[in-house]
Amino acid sequence: MRNTILFGVSMILLANFCFGIMSAFVKITADYFSPMENVFYRSITMTLLLLLIYPFKPYRLKSYKQGGFKKLAFRVVVGGLAMLAFFYNIEKISLATATAFSQCAPIYTVLLSPFLLKEKLKRSALISACIGLVGVVLISDPSVENVGPVEIFMGILSGIFVSLAYITLRDLREYYDKQAVILAFAFGMSLLGLVGMFIDIPFLSTGIHIPRKEDILWISLIGISGTLGQYFLTYAYMNAPAGIIAPIEYTRIVWGLLFGLYLGDTFLDLKSSLGVALILCSGLLIALPALLKELKKI
């Protein structure tokens, strides 16, 4: 049991590192590619890698039972919108702040679950979510770096859409193999990104820019790191309880800060640092009951 949990913890740490470095590569390419193009290149590379792996490690592609396609399509759309909003913010604001906005998903999950899942909202969870919302307000300061109304809106959207994707994943386990969900997400986002590149969308899609020689490396690294991150994330939740894994996911903000500083981001000021700290505390408090419950079983 302990070895399995240790393996799961190792996997989530690796996943967060991979997602962190993927975000750094996206920031590097953001000077040339639009957020929509980065979504497409990230997704199509991931799709090709998954198709190459499939013959060596096949899995069930068909659903276990009927009724899951709409849920899968919804997961693709909200997951794609979350990625698009996140990639936009990576281009415009510091990597740490963009990541912090995205990592607010558990806060929104707590607030949305009573309406979408008919779950009872506990007072402790509500207080924790409110602490996180204060953190969101603190990092949503227009006087800090380039955080304007559009960036704040995109940041909040990225967190909400990630939370909706997580909520949907709970149901999808009854219909599809985990690997099939990953492949469907990658393929669906490739299609959405491809179509989106031909549509002029302010801030998000500014036409098609043909990849230069030096861009091929970055595009490949974005796809590889994103694919590895998704695989490590899947294996983490397969081998260890979610109550133990979820709090560790917040190390992604640390990687966002470190990689951002390396790429030239300025260090967060006191107000933004406090906001990120409150978001971290909020997420940990939300996950604490499940974490303690799982630790007692060890």
Where do the protein language model's features map onto the residues?
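Membrane-interface interhelical linkers
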Residues: 1-14, 47-74, 123, 187, ...
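Juxtamembrane helix-entry segments on the extracytoplasmic side of multipass membrane proteins
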Residues: 4-7, 40, 64-68, 141-160, ...
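Hydrophobic/small/kink-forming positions within alpha-helical transmembrane segments
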Residues: 16-24, 51, 76-84, 106-111, ...
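Transmembrane alpha-helical segments that form core, pore/gating elements
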Residues: 24-27, 35, 50, 145-205, ...
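Structural signature of hydrophobic alpha-helical transmembrane segments
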Residues: 34-48, 88-105, 148-161, 212-226, ...
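Helix-helix packing/entry segments at the starts of transmembrane helices
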Residues: 41, 99-104, 172-188, 230-261
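C-terminal transmembrane-helix exit sites in multi-pass transporters
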Residues: 105-127, 254-273
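Hydrophobic transmembrane alpha-helices of multi-pass small-molecule transport proteins
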Residues: 124-141, 271-290
